[in-house]
Amino acid sequence: MDVVGIDVSKATLDAYALTSQQARQFANDPGGHQGLVAWLQELGVGVAVFEASGGYERAAAQSLRRAGLVAHVVDPKRVRYYARAAGQLAKTDRIDARMIAGFGAAFLLGKPGGIVGTDDPVRQDLAELVGTRQVLVDHRTGLQQQADAVTSAIAKKLLLAPLKQLDRQIETSDRQIAAAIARHEPFAALARRLDTVPGLGPVSIAALIAWLPELGQLDRRQLAALVGVAPFADDSGKRTGQRHIQGGRMKLRNILYMATVGAATRHNPVLQARYRRLLENGKKPKVALIACLRTLLTILNAMVARQQDWNPTRLPATEPVAA
């Protein structure tokens, strides 16, 4: 079974078929996507692998999936680590496509296509709305921080001037996100269920719906790794290193972390009790909050899987306090 790696840029798609060693370049537009599909079907390709490229890969990946082809989108870091392990230090579009194909052959054959939300245009639209809101919030935060740091009154005024407009745009985004969820009953039903959890607000609920379609379908460890809050070991010989988190969906993790801070310190009695126990056992506050975030994910996962609302008397088993 041939595997094709596809290196993506805004304008082009560079594809490399591993078994037949054929390379082609296509425009990254609807016509190019059709040409790519036809070429893959002609080669009898079983798996196509894209590097995540800031969203430029989405439309092409959607075209492949609509044509019945298996398409994966992978973290570029994983491909670079694979290339370095293979001794490939040079970097061109064609070499990148070949390395992506090699990575796919080594790790993805036999697995279903992995593209979050791309087979669901309604979720994709919601994800873009949620992402746009986050861009506006980040921009506002950055301007405010810069304004706080300057001493010139004129510079401060210039930096603060756009904030009211950004506030209005964020409010508009909130209304659009709420409307998008309300229009789609599966999303609306999920939002109502998640809204029963003390400490979860509209922003975190929308992020969960948009960016975590796997909620309720994986076990708690898989879900924690997906979000990027699973503790990874760092041991060697007799040395036991400190556990640490890495990878995952950073934007989602950041939003859920802020929700957890409020839930574990003020709004959610279950998470408050867990946070207190972790601190009493010597955990640092940030480590304890990450553990509470994992607990929150475990609870949410069970609620969605069981189709149950929040019930503090029927919570799933979580990791021990020492974790």
Predicted features, each with a name:
Residues M99, L158-A161, Q165, A189, ...:
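Amphipathic alpha-helical interaction segments
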Residues P202, A207-N281, P285, P312, ...:
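Phosphate-backbone recognition surface of nucleic-acid-processing proteins
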Residues E280-A323:
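Basic, amphipathic alpha-helical segments enriched in Lys/Arg and hydrophobic/aromatic residues
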Residues F103, L126, L194, L208, ...:
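Short alpha-helical scaffolding segments that buttress acidic/His motifs in well-ordered protein cores
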Residues I100, L136, L256, G282, ...:
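A residue-level signal for conserved active-site and pocket-lining positions in enzyme catalytic cores
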Residues F107-G113, L143, P213-Q217, G262-V270, ...:
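Short helix-capping/linker segments at secondary-structure and domain boundaries
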Residues A147-V203, L212, A264:
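Helix-hairpin-helix/helix-loop-helix acidic hairpins
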Residues M1-I154, K164-D167, T265, V287:
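Phosphate- and other anionic-substrate recognition elements at nucleic-acid/protein interfaces
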